[in-house]
């Protein structure tokens, strides 16, 4: 090969060269080979070689997966090579073309700055010229050349010029190196040839590997012939299967399907006693069918998948419940603040389970409904931990196909079990805690109603024999504790809601958020951002600044995000050299987080035709302004602000009440036919509905027609009748907290809600609020208007 490229002569003796480890290829003397180089130290070795005489020492790694090999990770014997060409390619890699020159042995290896340098003892190889060869040598050389012809005839792809070159070589050492470079052998075997300095022995090893490769090619050819004879008129797919079968016969692996059947049978015996009778028959039938089918057929694949699912289900496996009530209370108190009703309900459940051990306890499905971020999902995890059970969460938001719940029939391509059975398999026990998250956001489509499919799952009378369409065998779900979560109860289908025990979770007050931030969020977030507890201290005022100025939510999810934002910015300051400890004050919060996003929403001065109402949405309580104005017209009522039908009817009822009492409030009755009234609720892009704005609409309309301003430091809620009665509404705790957030400390509420408010509202919130409980609109107007309207005769 030296005739093809101009390469320098390398003298024997100790020389120093840059060293490049190779992952899985061995370069032999005279061998020309392209290499793709990506490791930085290898690229530097090439650069150093190119600066000098383009000579580099190439040596094989013992383990190709080692990224930064040390001295013990590489072999001692390698090849001094000449770099013929270097071409940079993408991704900062280079492609080099090298030619092996002479063998060498590493005497000393050093790391110089950023690459290896080796002291190499270059070997002066003494080959055996034709005149010095024995008859055995010549016979071996001839046998090797004939074997090359045999390889080519068996389909081995070798460059024709290389075959000619091999035929011309008469020295055993050079012939061995040339043939070794084209053999399909492991890198460790190639290294063994490289380390054989004796040319005779080297050629013998090459001949052995050559015969092994010829043997493999002959077997491959024989397998092809056997398969071709059996193929007849079948398609290519059948031909490939026959080849595989012939390979299995040649290797003695035809018993693979038998081992598979034995494994399925063993698994079946382990769960057989816990399966229903129809399930036992179905599994036995499918195992027998699998035995008769061709292992590569499509039907066999379907049966295998089904058996894998069925036999991996925890038919017999269950966890033991932990009935320690004190431990359960500790876990619930540790992970969640307040939520006493929920905690008491869990303790009650545990108490019943403990008292009915060995008997069938009544199954209860709990449903946690409340705004985002109040701890519904995490509460499920705590319940599972308190009970000592596995926990699995199923996200139901946006699911519109009942097959997601009940599974697909096996006849469909790509069929799978539904999410319930998948959750059971994931848990690995038949009595986990399964959380059905966002159950209020299930959708209906032409593919069916997933809410209807859940009826069987959540009904204690039916779920003992829940049948997934894919599995086709009844599975007992009666031991599973199902916990559902949602933001609104009114969007959960009534039949589904009827199967649940509804537990309402309200939003947190400012004081509760402060406590949660100090006791839970901040201690958890400080180490997550790389600080020790001693380095960071939040003042109460700083936390309140974040709560009031940068969050507007019922839960604490956004509060956690804002605290994280503060800690991230403090982390940057620390890395820039600022010394701790860091004391987080309101001023620092404003500096780090910028201008507060939320300001108190209430108007300061009393306004005519504007009242402050209270709304309850799925994200918590909010205040909303009801604006009313009039213009010349014919007595029509215009309503805007993306209002629902119920809210429009409330506005109509409020106007009718004002008209019926016009003279009592000093209003000329004729004016109603001479003007149009327009009622608007700002934030028109947000849909609004419900009867609870009736009180606020009536107040705004009375203010409009009497020109008496409405107090802006008073908020109100309540449904009204045409007689002026104030009826009870829901979500009062959230509404009162919304008023408090907006710095409105006086609230008008229906009298029939008084007991509920007094029970649910924390005392520290009640102390700061002035709550007016009213029965009719007369009482509302006395409180909400800056002065009482006078009857028409008096006016």
UniProtKB/Swiss-Prot annotation:
One of its GO terms (molecular function) is ATP binding. It holds the Pfam family Lon_C. Induction: By heat shock. InterPro entries: AAA+_ATPase, ATPase_AAA_core, Lon_bac, Lon_bac/euk-typ, Lon_lid, Lon_proteolytic, Lon_Prtase, Lon_prtase_N. It is an enzyme of class 3 (hydrolase). ATP binds at residues 370-377. Its EC number is 3.4.21.53. Residues 17-214 form the Lon N-terminal domain. Residues 605-787 form the Lon proteolytic domain. Its main location: cytoplasm. HAMAP family: lon_bact (MF_01973). Belongs to the peptidase S16 family. Homohexamer. Organized in a ring with a central cavity. This is Lon protease. It comes from Aquifex aeolicus (strain VF5).
